[in-house]
């Protein structure tokens, strides 16, 4: 049904039109009454005559009007949509934006919408505008703040800030803009309040000095590790303190290399320090915090790289410029890697020098040799070359093996008299022989009979090659035998290892042996398997990973709480053993202090005093028999060539 012209339609027609025609001014022509929303004094100008569409339908103007209405509606819809996109983020558009940032190609081939979980933005450096005004997080540099002083509309930031109020559970975001009158230290406290303080400091360091901080230092995970050289970078130092730092640091250090740079955070001080004594990171941090008057967290503290040539060249080159203040003697690790003369002196590692060091210091353990030789790297060129080598473990093993070969050959060529003299020369203290004699008398042992048996014992006479010290517990048997064994450099064997075929192997590398605390089971084992060993005749000993070794058993001492001479089951051992009984408890002068001290110095004096009674060869006779008296050398000497 066709609608009538004008505004006199039914109520349903007004509802279909949207209801906005009801606010039109209504005039009753019969009585000339004016509606309340229209001015009475206003004159009619005729400008609103075209407001009512009274055209005749079908005149041909419907199509342009409909097209204009469609274009207007599209423009309005686009404007509203743009406004919605600015103030209310669409879930679909946000998800597609994130997926676009992660991988545009992957988003282009996706067939459906993926999960709406939050994803990290990979290619966006600045956070997107949320649409709720110019809210801003804490900035990292003052340049970023000055660039955002005004928003897109040209209004100040303070006029554009919006505070979130209500129960949405989100914290208010405010703008932190440093004022022009704020000092450098105050700015640092604000600027360094970031999520990763250390990363911020490292980034600022590289911008100022042009090199990465960790390219010059090595990292100590523990803050308790001590070191004499430290690299310190301090941020936010006052200008007056930075100027006087060279004088302030001198009482604490032997060497200082100080560089000062000016930045937006204040003065940045970069130092290479050598302290008077070794300090750990905590001590250095407290010391520098006290001198510079800054928090400890505003400093980077690590030890320098001692074997890095680029790092040494950096310190050497910057020390020559006018931007550094240096005092003290340059550390040797910088000199060694930068000066031409020191570089030419670097030589290749020589194993013979290491073997000679192990031989001279009587080192036959790999761990001891590796540790002690590495400590000589600062003063010995060969030790420094050893540390620079990639075959340190192989060199240590080979050096110890060669040292053992030399020691074994030297020991086998010596007689017992020569060996006692050799061991006595290693003792520099002066002792007294009387405590040994007094201890034997305290135990009821006649000194003359002991010397007679001891003389045959040292010579290795068959059937007299073993001395047994018998007695109850706590009488000093092990103390007496251990002191003699330590002086003569002997070996200890234990019956606990008798299940192994190699438990007698230590006897092949010693001049004297000790079997401590022999039990009845041990005596039964000796009676069955080791009779020839006690006789002093040649026996065959099995060695691990080596062929059987035939040797004459060295003199053997045995301590026991069981008297083997009183048991009939061991009657075949009676002629092979010389037994001394210790009856009395071991005497003490005070708790932990023996009344009769027996040590290497006392044993040295004892042998010197009893040398003739023990029928030992004199040193003069040994030299006459072909001993040159010169120390062993495994390092080739330099030949003096005439021109």
From Swiss-Prot:
Residues annotated for ATP binding in this entry: 471-478
Q: Where is this cross-link: Glycyl lysine isopeptide (Lys-Gly) (interchain with G-Cter in SUMO)?
A: 552
EC assignment: the record states: 5.6.2.4
- Where, by residue number, is the motif Nuclear export signal? 102-111
Q: GO biological process: any one?
A: DNA replication
Alphabetized InterPro entries for the sequence: Helicase_SF3_DNA-vir, P-loop_NTPase, PPV_DNA_helicase_E1_C, PPV_DNA_helicase_E1_N, PPV_E1_DBD, PPV_E1_DBD_sf, Rep_E1_papillomaV, Znf_lg_T-Ag_D1_dom_sf
Gene Ontology CC: one annotated term: host cell nucleus
- Motif, Nuclear localization signal: chain positions: 84-86
DNA-binding region: annotated segments: 180-346
Which intervals carry biased composition (Acidic residues)? 36-51
Q: Which Gene3D superfamilies does the record associate with it?
A: 3.40.1310.10, P-loop containing nucleotide triphosphate hydrolases, Zinc finger, large T-antigen D1 domain
Which residues, renumbered to this chain, carry the PTM Phosphoserine? Answer: 90, 103
Q: Which reaction does it catalyse?
A: Couples ATP hydrolysis with the unwinding of duplex DNA by translocating in the 3'-5' direction; ATP + H2O = ADP + phosphate + H(+)
Enzyme superclass (EC): isomerase
Q: Using the UniProt record, give the first listed, main subcellular location.
A: host cell
The protein's location, in the record's own words, is: Host nucleus
Q: Which GO terms describe its molecular function?
A: ATP binding; ATP hydrolysis activity; DNA binding; DNA helicase activity
Location of region: Disordered = 28-58, 119-138, 143-181, 617-643
* Keyword entries, A-Z: ATP-binding, DNA replication, DNA-binding, Early protein, Helicase, Host nucleus, Hydrolase, Isomerase, Isopeptide bond, Nucleotide-binding, Phosphoprotein, Ubl conjugation
Which family is annotated? Belongs to the papillomaviridae E1 protein family.
What is the annotated quaternary arrangement, including any partners? Can form hexamers. Interacts with E2 protein; this interaction increases E1 DNA binding specificity. Interacts with host DNA polymerase subunit POLA2. Interacts with host single stranded DNA-binding protein RPA1. Interacts with host TOP1; this interaction stimulates the enzymatic activity of TOP1.
Describe the function of this protein: ATP-dependent DNA 3'-5' helicase required for initiation of viral DNA replication. It forms a complex with the viral E2 protein. The E1-E2 complex binds to the replication origin which contains binding sites for both proteins. During the initial step, a dimer of E1 interacts with a dimer of protein E2 leading to a complex that binds the viral origin of replication with high specificity. Then, a second dimer of E1 displaces the E2 dimer in an ATP-dependent manner to form the E1 tetramer.
What's the protein called, per UniProt?
Replication protein E1
Which gene underlies this protein?
Answer: E1
